[in-house]
Each structure stands twice: as C-alpha cells, then as structure tokens.
Amino acid sequence: MIDIQEIKEALPHRYPMLLVDRVLEVSEDTIVAIKNVTINEPFFNGHFPQYPVMPGVLIMEALAQTAGVLELSKPENKGKLVFYAGMDKVKFKKQVVPGDQLVMTATFVKRRGTIAVVEAKAEVDGKLAASGILTFAIGN
C-alpha cells in the first residue's frame, strides 16, 4: 500500500488537482488506487450545483495520475515527470457522485523508449464507471 505522503512524493500534483488518495495494490505493471469523492470537491460547485456529477475528464485525469504513481515510484524514474500524451477508446458508463469511492486500475501494456501505453478503468461499487487507453511520455 502507498499512502498519501508517498503519492505526493511521486506526483507533482497538489490540491485541488491531486486525485489519488491511496494505492491499494502495486506490482511491476499494474496499480490499483482509490479516490474518495466528496461533496467538498471544488468542481461540484459548477458541475452541477443541483445535481453534482464528477466530470468525466477528471475521472480520466485520476486514472492518469494512478498510472503516474506506478511509473514515477520506480527507482529509474525518480525526479522525472509523466506527461499525458493522449486518450483512446474512452467510455463513460456510470455517473460518479459525492459519496462514491472510485477504484482505479491501470495496467501498462506497451513501452517503447520514453512512451508508455496504459489500459485503465475506474469502478464504483464493482461497476465500471469509465475506461480507456492512455498514452504517456516520461521526461525530465
């Protein structure tokens, strides 16, 4: 398990853009993390005041950060940054609302030099909320 302090050591993101609360599992190429979604998230002020829903693009950002924790916690990548380079086959299946816990899984499926491709999914209560293929560049 990786706690919030270690996550902050790996990622450059800070409030309100740090979207990973804890890592539950980590292996060489797969990571499982959580984001506890609360009504106090700043984006709920405008998305939408009467019916708060987590923006899909922020779910994808949370998945990207999850993958970033895995990559940046490797000794050879200490001090580097992960740059989000693209998304493909993104699907949103379930709304994410205050009180939900996003369980995010990212698996690296391809690496070539400084480019990495990840299959990622976010679930709430065991149901798929979002998924997609993410591309990253690792750099200084």
From Swiss-Prot:
Q: Record's GO cellular component, any one?
A: membrane
User: Which reactions fall under this protein's catalytic activity?
Assistant: a (3R)-hydroxyacyl-[ACP] = a (2E)-enoyl-[ACP] + H2O
Q: Which UniProt keywords apply?
A: Cytoplasm, Lipid A biosynthesis, Lipid biosynthesis, Lipid metabolism, Lyase
Where does it primarily localize?
A: cytoplasm
Q: What is its EC number?
A: 4.2.1.59
UniProt record, GO biological process: fatty acid biosynthetic process; lipid A biosynthetic process
The protein here is known as 3-hydroxyacyl-[acyl-carrier-protein] dehydratase FabZ
